[in-house]
């Protein structure tokens, strides 16, 4: 399925499949405004009905324990109330606002609230055939369409699992859109190896996503790396040695000293993100660092991991080869799921087994090696091999493993004729014999992936070589995010 929405709206798409991953981030803040008839005497007669459905909505949402609710203090029936209540929710910092319709209401009230509140907006009509709530919602929706305010629509009893999931899907998507605004991406280096797909227009980023771009020279990594205390490096190397499956020093491209240099690079890059308050980064690496200092594979792995050699930490999105649209895609996935995100290439399609082979040139977060919050469970499946000297003269370790099996959502922001769109690809990582790793680049991390589409459709339609993945099914949320920010999308699925 595909969408071509710019200012037009699509109904909220709801998944009824059991989600394997759960939202683990801090509770999303959902604002709720309820609308009534603009005639005072009619409004007063409808207060009990409105309050009944509002109470049912609030109690049902509270039971999920996923949301912090900010409910308007009054049921809205005047323009003054609409403006004041919307502004109050905006000041409270809601991640999105639900417009609640149980009875007939004057539709201009919703427009006034939307003009003065904080979107994205979800219009909900409760299941109440005795009152024209659905009519009110559709009238309000039509008015919002006319003034160009994007919104989603949902109808039914909130006790219905589909409706409840629709509300949760909406607010999680809305929170991504709002939390992305005001963030800063650090571009460490510049465009890598002539890839247009990695370079961006800062004006376009700010206009569409609300994200700023801060440039940092790769020299910062090298200078800071040499200042990291030796004892810290030794402890980190010991920590890795005790936990990974193997560090293969059999080839000249990987030595203990080169491992230490990679560890230094990691700490230096982490220090840069903290000092400059960067929310996510892209590191060029190739060819300057990979030829003359050391590959940044270890940095990308452990920045994206929810832990490192010093313990648990927040995952910091890091895009390989300074792929900025890739890093932005990853940040969207991270904000949506609060989980590590993969960065890799579409390397090969196995026609005999109907498997796509996704691989990175040396680095992926180690979380995907075991899909565990315990680093030991993941790292026991990880081997550090020497990088390919043909491409990487400075050497260093690759972070090699096979992705643990499970349902995944793959995504990629791309541009066509300057216009952004998102590729959304539901899939599944599967386990195969370890010997299969040798069919491509055995020293690199790989994910063997089942997709429900024809290989030619994906290869002809995808907007670049890099894609990004998280465990779980988040197709509907990504579709909603695209609608909220006004970009096109295409879901590559045979279903």
Which ranges hold each PLM region?
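Conserved anion/nucleotide-ligand pocket segment
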Residues: 32, 172-204, 208, 354-372
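Short, Lys/Arg-enriched N-terminal segments with co-localized hydrophobic residues
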Residues: 11-24
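Extended hydrophobic packing segments that form well-structured cores
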Residues: 383-495
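FMN-binding flavodoxin-like domain, especially the glycine-rich phosphate-binding loop
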Residues: 152-157, 343
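C-terminal catalytic subdomain
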Residues: 307-432
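Long, internal scaffold/assembly segments composed of regular secondary structure
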Residues: 243-336
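Metallocofactor- and cofactor-centric catalytic cores in central/energy metabolism, strongly enriched
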Residues: 23-138, 145-146, 155-174, 195, ...
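Ser/Thr/Gly-rich flexible loops in soluble cytosolic domains mediating phosphotransfer, phosphorylation
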Residues: 124-148, 314-332
């Amino acid at each position: 399925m595909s969408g071509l929405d710019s200012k037009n709206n699509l109904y909220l798409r709801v998944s009824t499949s059991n989600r394997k991953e759960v939202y683990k981030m801090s509770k999303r803040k959902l604002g709720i405004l309820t609308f009534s008839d603009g005639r005072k005497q009619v409004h007063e007669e409808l207060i009990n009905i409105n309050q009944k459905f509002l109470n049912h909505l609030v109690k049902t949402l509270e039971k999920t324990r996923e949301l912090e609710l900010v409910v308007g203090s009054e049921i809205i029936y005047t323009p003054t109330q609409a403006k004041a209540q919307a502004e109050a929710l905006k000041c409270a910092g809601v991640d999105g606002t639900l417009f609640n319709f149980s009875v007939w209401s004057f539709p201009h009230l919703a427009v006034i609230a939307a003009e003065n509140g904080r979107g994205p907006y979800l219009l909900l009509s409760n299941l109440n055939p005795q009152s024209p709530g659905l009519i009110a919602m559709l009238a309000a929706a039509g008015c919002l369409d006319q003034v160009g305010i994007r919104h989603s629509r949902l109808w039914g009893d909130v006790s219905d699992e589909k409706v409840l999931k629709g509300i949760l899907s909406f607010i999680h998507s809305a929170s991504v859109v709002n939390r992305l605004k005001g963030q800063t991406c650090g571009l460490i280096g510049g465009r890598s190896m002539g890839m247009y797909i990695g370079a961006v227009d800062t004006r376009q980023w700010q206009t569409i996503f609300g994200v700023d771009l801060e440039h940092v020279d790769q020299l910062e990594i090298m200078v800071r790396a040499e200042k990291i205390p030796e004892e810290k490096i030794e402890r980190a190397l010991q920590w890795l040695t005790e936990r990974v499956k193997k560090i293969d020093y059999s080839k000249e491209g990987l030595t203990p000293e080169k491992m230490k240099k990679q560890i230094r690079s990691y700490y230096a890059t982490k220090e840069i993100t903290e000092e400059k308050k960067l929310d996510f980064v892209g590191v060029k690496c190739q060819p300057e660092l990979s030829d003359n200092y050391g590959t940044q594979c270890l940095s990308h792995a452990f920045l994206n991991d929810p832990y490192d050699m010093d313990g648990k930490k927040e995952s910091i999105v890091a895009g390989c080869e300074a792929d900025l649209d890739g890093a932005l895609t990853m940040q969207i996935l991270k904000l949506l799921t609060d989980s590590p995100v993969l960065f890799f290439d579409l390397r090969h399609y196995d026609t005999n087994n109907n498997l796509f082979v996704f691989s990175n040139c040396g680095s992926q977060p180690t979380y995907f090696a075991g899909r565990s919050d315990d680093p030991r469970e993941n790292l026991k499946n990880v081997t550090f091999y020497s990088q390919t000297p043909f491409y990487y003269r400075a050497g260093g370790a690759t972070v090699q493993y096979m992705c643990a099996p499970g349902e995944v959502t793959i995504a990629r922001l791309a541009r066509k004729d300057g216009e952004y769109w998102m590729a959304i690809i539901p899939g599944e990582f599967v386990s195969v014999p370890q010997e299969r790793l040798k069919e491509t680049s055995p020293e690199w991390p790989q994910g063997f992936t089942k997709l429900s589409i024809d290989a030619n459709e994906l290869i002809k339609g995808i907007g670049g070589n890099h894609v990004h993945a998280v465990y779980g099914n988040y197709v509907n949320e990504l579709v909603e995010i695209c609608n909220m920010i006004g970009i096109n999308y295409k879901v590559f699925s045979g279903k």
